[in-house]
């Protein structure tokens, strides 16, 4: 469970997030909707531990972000456009990312790719993927993380 309490973020005196409070239950899928510049990406960056709040707190599974843990280890997210190496296949891109954490097998990577409707055996380079295929690969990345 993710619990956000009175989260505020300011840059140079300008408040970009103002007293956000919400609870996100484990096992559910959520989406953030809002106009450009409304703070959706900034909120996600806080939840992922990339940015620290000016005030307020984020608790993930009972651990306070920035105090008990630096970043959540069980949350996958796609923020903006995922960056992949265009000269490699989808599987090879995800394999390189997985090698950083040493937590996931080749079969688990292939299953994540299949789950989003792509072929893990395809040798097609990501640079030749359509936008939709790249977005699907980004979802596979979030799932495997």
Model-found features: residue ranges?
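Helix-to-loop junction immediately C-terminal to a conserved catalytic motif
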Residues: 48
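Conserved ABC transporter NBD signature motif
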Residues: 56-71
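The feature captures the beta-strand-to-loop junction immediately N-terminal to the Walker
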Residues: 30-35
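Conserved ABC ATPase "signature" region
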Residues: 95, 106-121
